[in-house]
Amino acid sequence: MTTPVTILHGATVFTAAGGDPFEGSVVVAGDRIANVLTGPSAPSRSGRVIDLHGATLLPGLIDAHVHAAAVRADIQDQHRDLFDSELAVLTARSLTEMLERGFTTVRDAGGADAGYRRLIERGDLAGPRLLVSGRPLTQTGGHGDSRRATESHDFAACPRAQGMTHAVADGPDAVRHAAREELRRGADQIKVMAGGGVMSPTDRLESVQYSLAELSAAVGAAAASGTYVLAHAYTPEAIEVCVAAGVRSIEHGNLLNEPVARLMAQAGTFLVPTLVTYEKLYEQGEELGIPRANLDKLGAIIDAGVNSLRIARGAGVKIGSGSDLLGPMRVHQGREIALQAQALGAAGAIVAATRTNAELLGIDAETGTIEPGKAADLIAVDGDPLADPGLLADPGRLRLVMRAGRTHIDRTG
């Protein structure tokens, strides 16, 4: 059987592998990039030729922090209001929409289970390459413990539901068991809540959650299964404990300071900023039903986000890219790149959302750059996102979206 060949010709190509953009062509054979050619001439190889003049060809985008199952902005109550069947359909739809926004790989940071990954891998669901974390681990009263202060029942007595549920575990043994349980259920990596957050009802944003021993137990369980831990943390105090425990990536990190950034760089710990979620929570949160008590927590972090990137960059921390958007705010997923460009520059922000994220996720041999032999995860954007990264926030600018050689959006003709 002949392998189908597609020639993407005439675009400005930004490989994200190093070097400047250039006019050229990319040859796709089956699900792989077969060749990358410079110059205006179309390659002589036979195959379907797609004219991309006026567009920029990039690696497919990677979002290292999504919550596909956060189908409503007020995630604390969605499991009380939706049947599991409703939530499953809405979660599947959200994954398809991420692919249609140019994200060919996403890491779910809590909520989606391995079933969605299997659906995508089998071809039963159009969606990005998906790595799932299962249920995030949190301590009693920590970020993700959705019980209100007035509720006295044990967390385990809460009705089991899909979506934005968490595993409450206290003490190293319980944390180790909880991590192993999520791995048993198919998690690709483990998510822990190491500090306070915006969306939970009882914890303070500045609180440090989970001890070194507890975090080390989670890291050990993950490492024994050949994977890693990502940790929700805002403050230097919480981040420092995570680094000491061997956590691979810090999610958010808005209040990062220089001494702790240096520790992260020395340890090889990644930072995954999620600037866009704070912008959109501030703009839309109240009208979408998020309680005022939660939104009041934004003050300490919304203006600190870009500065944390500058601190991290100055210290040599590897910076990835996430969105963390909830419910209808997810339409702004691509805006994260423009926000990060304020600190990293446009090219740096695109690299964060492609090559660096691929390295973080351990899939850099497969995707993240435009190089021969890698998966044909590619997007073509009308215009020049290296001059205006805001173009990536508009899915209507996408002329082509290809994942593993399969075309999902084609507006070329």
Predicted regions and their residues:
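N-terminal metal-binding scaffold of metallo-dependent hydrolase/deaminase domains
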Residues: 1-44, 57, 385-388, 406-407
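His/Asp/Glu-enriched, well-ordered alpha-helical/loop segment
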Residues: 224, 228, 289-293, 299-385
